[in-house]
């Protein structure tokens, strides 16, 4: 196997001369420092090369060494310092965080470290150039790894147009210097890892699924008729084995025979529930598809969603609302405990619900629906042109701007609708509060760049569907009354009864929340519930695919 040192001039050597004496008998610290300084000063700004590769922290790294007066950070004149071993150890284990050790020069660092250890064993001192190479790579490894831990390997806003991330920032150069001074390299990097229990649970799931992948392969359930309770088939024996491997069926309940009994039905329901399927207990086409998804795909899903955790703020808030688009679900969380759940309807694939965080500050009871221009011209105008009575039946008004932020109501009978088009529509449409209003009786506002909010709906039947991507981007919620009661908690004027009365009154009212509540619109295709159940969902917007491609193309430069 070819050694990774590549003639020991692995970092920056091809662009800079060697200082006389650096490889000879002189090993004073000032020789190594002078060599380090010359390399950094002669390197192109923001383009420090290492065997043809750009050092990822090339914007931060020179400033770090300048502050130190170019003193080496990771070695003495004889050998690597203890903090170097601590960093190498951390990098060796960083795959537990779904990060890649080789991204942080692990192979080169281990080789250079071993070369210095060999030199010490021979009572020799390592060449200054080797020490400088090692030092630069170590510093780059810390800065890059730290950056990936706190804000992810890629920037989601460069992958998705509809993803706004409040990613964390740290002055990693200063963080590194403090860690070196305190001799706490490993502890410092661990302190940067997300502390949310959901991240920790998903990280444990990654370890569990990697162990499963190293064990007995998941058997494939062949295509065939629907398997259901009281039936017999050879495939049922295979089904039992498959469900035992993922813990959906306990080993003690596995009779090993071909009968679809009560215990197997419950195991199938459990499997279906944690994969977002209707838990009917029968193994049809969709359940077979989920059962036959390779474990490598599931591991990749977990890794992608750990990356998404790193895009979130450090604190989600002691009270916050989580909407998982891929799960069509909403959770209210207090002190890391889920206290309220409900189904939601999200945007269609071509009108996707965006991902972002905001602060809910008020609710609007009996809201008007100000129809977005795109919906008015693309969807409603053709209906109006076919039936001029459509607006009256739908309780809609036609408005026209008259300047100074004022509008006037226009008689729809005075408008020549057939002359209008998507490019020629000088009106606005507004639907009155009432049973036909798609916003229902209440909406929950957290101002944002996307104009997205949570709201009641007049189409209650959609919550009976398993997949619920039907909206234009806003989020319809299953339990608006319970949710309103929660967010207005603390205001004695807004009891459940008073909220119901206000909704029934048909009068539009804006009510400020007693205190703002964080709202996080997320997209998770893999997560772990509080009870330890590993959940997977279909990638309804193909965002897993986009993220996989971005990670393959390159990682974020700090």
What is the meaning of each model-derived region?
Residues 8-17:
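Bacterial N-terminal signal peptides
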Residues 1-9:
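Bacterial N-terminal signal peptides that target proteins for export
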Residues 22-66, 136, 140-143, 163, ...:
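Well-ordered beta-sheet/strand-loop patches within structured domains
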